[in-house]
C-alpha cells in the first residue's frame, strides 16, 4: 500500500511526534501541530474564502467526502493552499513542480500524521505506520523485502490464478442468473483472498459467503473511523464509534492471532511472508521480529495488501466498461500474448503492456491511496518561494497531482491509457505519477499489486465483455483509501477468442476514448 494519509488535513487528531529521516537518522523536532509554526510565511499561501473564527474553513465541507472537498479547493486556489479547522491549519500541495521538490529524499522524508497516525492504535509501528525514528521499520523492511522479489512473485503466481478462478466461477454463476456483478465487493473478496493465500496460507472463503467476511467488516470499520477522526475536533465526540472501533481492532487481532497460532502449530509453511516474519533474522544484525510486531505486520499486510488493489481494479473495470475501444484493444493484446494457453504463465503477465497502461491510467485518475505527507529534514524553501522550518510538513494530494494540466495536458481529466506509452512517459517530467507514494517509505508491495491487478484484468477481458449500467454515475467512497461506490456491471460471456493476426499486432487500434462526462472540474466524482 502506498503511504496514504487522511485527506482533509482539518482534524483534531493526534499531534505528530519526533521523527527521523531514513537517510540521515538525525532526530527531527516535534512535529508542528499547526502550520503556523512550521511555515514562516504562511500568509502568502491562499486559503478558502469565508473562513469563520474558531471553526475555520468548514463552510461547505463534507464529513463523508473530505478528499473531494480538497480537490475542489485545489482547483480554486492553485498548486499550494491551506485549510484550517478547529484551531489547526494545514498545507496542501498538488502542483507537479512542488510535488517533485518534496520528492527529494535529501530534503524531505515521509511524515506520519493525520490518517496514518489514526491507524497506530490498530497496527502500531508496522511498516506503513512506523515513525521514521522507530527501528522496527528498517528491521521489518529488510526482513520482508525478499518476499517481493521476482522469485517470490513467481511462486505467488499460481495461487493468484487459483483465486482468480474462484472469482470467474462466481461471475459465471451471477451471469447465468441474469444478475449484474458487484464490482467493488467482488474485487475486495478477490484481493483479500489473494494476499491471505499468498502471504499467510489462509483461506477466508470469501466467495462462499453471501456477506463480506467479518474481517472485511472490521477492516472497513477501522479505516472509516480513522477517517472520521480527521473531521472532528476531539475523539470524545465519537464515543459510540470509538467503542465500535475498539471492537473492530480486537476482532482483527484475534483473527491474526489464530492465523499465527495455526502456522506455529502446523510446523511452518512454504516460505511465504508469514514464515519470513516468524523465522527470518535480519541479515546483518540477526534480530527477529517480536510477536507483537508480527501481529502488527500481518494486520497491515492483510488490510493494505488488498484494500488499495481492489479499488484500483474496480476503477479500471469502470473505465473499461465506459470505453469499449480501449477494452477491445486490451482484449486483443490478451488474445495475442496469451494465445491458446489455458492459463497464463508468470512471464506472460508482464507482456500485457497495454493492459498495464489501462491500470496505470485508472490509478492516475483515481489513485486509491489519494494523498501522502512529507516533512522537511532541515530548514528549506519549497519551490524557491515557500520557507519551511525543519519538521514542517505538507500533504501532497496525489489525486490532484495526477490531474495537473502542466504535467498531463489540458485534457487531464480524460481517460486515455496512451498517456503511459513508453515515449509519453519518457517525455513527461519525473515525480508526476505517484500512486504508491515516494522514496524509501514507498509501498513495499507495489510489484505484487501490479502483477495481481494486471493478471486479473487480463483474465476478465479474456472471458467477458463488460457492460456498464447506463444509469450509473461514478460516486467515490472515502475511507482513507478510495473505492467506487455502488458500481455494478453486466457481463456478456465471450465467444472463443479469434486467432491472433499474423503480424502479432493488436487489433482495434482506435485511439478514441470516452471523455469524462463533465468538463474539467475540481470535484472529480459526479459524472466520471
Whereabouts are the PLM-identified features?
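Cytochrome P450 catalytic-core helices
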Residues: 308-326, 331-333, 447-463
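Conserved cytochrome P450 K-helix E-x-x-R motif and the immediately C-terminal K′/meander segment
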Residues: 57-78, 258, 342-383
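Cytochrome P450 heme-thiolate monooxygenase catalytic core
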Residues: 21, 31-43, 111-118, 136, ...
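N-terminal membrane-proximal hinge/A-helix region immediately C-terminal to the signal-anchor transmembrane segment
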Residues: 2-6, 17-125, 135, 139, ...
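Cytochrome P450 proximal C-terminal region
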Residues: 24-45, 74, 164-168, 217-221, ...
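Cytochrome P450 I-helix active-site segment
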Residues: 39, 47-50, 157-161, 216-218, ...
Amino acid at each position: 500500500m502506498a503511504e496514504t494519509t487522511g485527506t482533509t488535513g482539518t482534524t483534531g487528531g493526534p499531534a505528530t511526534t519526533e521523527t527521523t529521516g531514513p537517510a540521515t537518522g538525525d532526530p527531527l523536532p516535534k512535529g508542528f501541530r499547526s502550520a503556523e509554526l512550521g511555515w514562516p510565511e504562511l500568509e502568502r499561501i491562499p486559503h478558502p474564502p469565508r473562513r469563520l473564527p474558531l471553526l475555520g474553513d468548514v463552510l461547505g465541507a463534507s464529513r463523508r467526502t473530505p478528499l473531494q472537498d480538497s480537490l475542489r479547493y485545489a482547483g480554486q486556489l492553485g498548486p499550494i493552499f491551506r485549510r484550517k479547522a478547529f484551531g489547526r491549519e494545514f498545507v496542501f500541495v498538488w502542483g507537479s513542480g512542488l510535488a517533485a521538490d518534496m520528492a527529494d529524499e535529501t530534503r524531505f522524508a515521509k511524515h506520519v500524521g493525520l490518517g496514518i497516525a489514526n491507524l497506530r492504535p490498530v497496527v502500531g509501528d508496522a511498516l506503513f505506520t512506523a515513525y521514521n525514528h522507530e527501528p522496527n521499520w528498517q528491521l521489518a523492511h529488510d526482513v520482508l523485502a525478499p518476499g517481493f522479489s521476482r522469485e517470490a512473485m513467481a511462486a505467488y503466481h499460481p495461487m493468484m490464478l487459483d483465486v482468480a478462478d474462484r472469482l470467474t466461477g462466481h461471475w459465471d454463476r451471477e451471469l447465468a442468473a441474469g444478475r449484474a456483478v458487484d464490482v467493488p465487493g467482488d474485487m475486495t473478496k478477490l484481493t483479500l483472498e489473494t494476499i491471505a493465500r499468498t502471504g499467510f496460507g489462509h483461506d477466508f472463503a470469501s466467495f462462499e459467503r453471501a456477506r463480506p467476511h467479518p474481517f472485511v467488516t472490521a477492516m472497513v470499520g477501522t479505516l472509516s473511523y480513522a477517517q472520521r477522526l480527521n473531521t472532528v475536533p476531539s475523539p470524545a465526540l465519537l464515543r459510540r464509534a470509538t467503542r465500535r472501533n475498539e471492537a473492530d481492532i480486537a476482532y482483527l487481532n484475534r483473527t491474526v492471532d489464530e492465523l499465527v497460532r495455526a502456522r506455529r502449530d502446523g510446523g511452518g509453511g512454504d516460505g511465504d511472508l508469514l514464515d519470513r516474519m516468524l523465522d527470518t533474522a535480519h541479515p546483518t544484525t540477526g534480530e527477529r521480529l517480536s510477536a507483537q510486531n508480527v501481529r502488527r505486520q500481518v494486520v497491515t499486510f492483510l488490510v493494505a495488501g488488498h484494500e488499495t488493489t481492489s479499488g484500483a481494479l474496480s476503477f479500471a473495470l469502470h473505465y473499461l466498461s465506459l470505453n469499449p475501444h480501449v477494452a477491445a484493444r486490451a482484449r486483443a493484446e490478451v488474445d495475442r500474448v496469451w494465445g491458446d494457453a489455458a492459463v497464463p504463465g508468470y512471464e506472460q503477465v508482464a507482456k500485457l503492456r497495454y493492459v498495464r497502461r489501462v491500470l496505470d491510467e485508472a490509478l492516475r485518475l483515481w489513485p486509491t491511496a489519494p494523498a501522502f505527507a512529507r516533512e522537511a529534514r532541515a530548514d528549506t524553501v519549497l519551490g524557491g518561494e515557500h520557507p519551511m522550518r525543519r519538521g514542517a510538513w505538507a500533504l501532497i494530494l496525489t489525486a490532484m497531482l495526477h490531474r495537473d494540466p502542466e504535467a498531463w495536458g489540458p485534457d487531464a481529466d480524460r481517460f486515455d491509457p496512451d498517456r503511459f506509452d513508453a515515449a509519453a512517459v519518457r517525455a513527461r517530467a519525473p515525480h508526476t505519477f505517484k500512486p504508491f507514494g515516494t522514496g524509501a517509505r514507498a509501498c513495499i508491495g507495489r510489484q505484487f499489486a501490479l502483477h495481481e491487478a494486471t493478471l486479473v484484468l487480463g483474465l476478465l477481458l479474456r472471458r467477458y465483455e463488460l457492460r456498464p449500467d447506463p444509469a450509473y454515475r461514478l460516486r467515490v467512497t472515502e475511507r482513507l483509501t478510495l473505492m467506487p461506490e455502488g458500481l455494478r456491471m453486466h457481463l456478456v460471456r465471450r465467444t472463443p477468442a479469434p486467432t491472433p493476426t499474423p503480424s502479432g499486432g493488436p487489433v482495434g487500434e482506435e485511439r478514441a476514448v470516452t471523455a469524462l462526462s463533465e468538463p474539467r472540474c475540481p470535484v472529480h466524482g459526479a459524472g466520471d
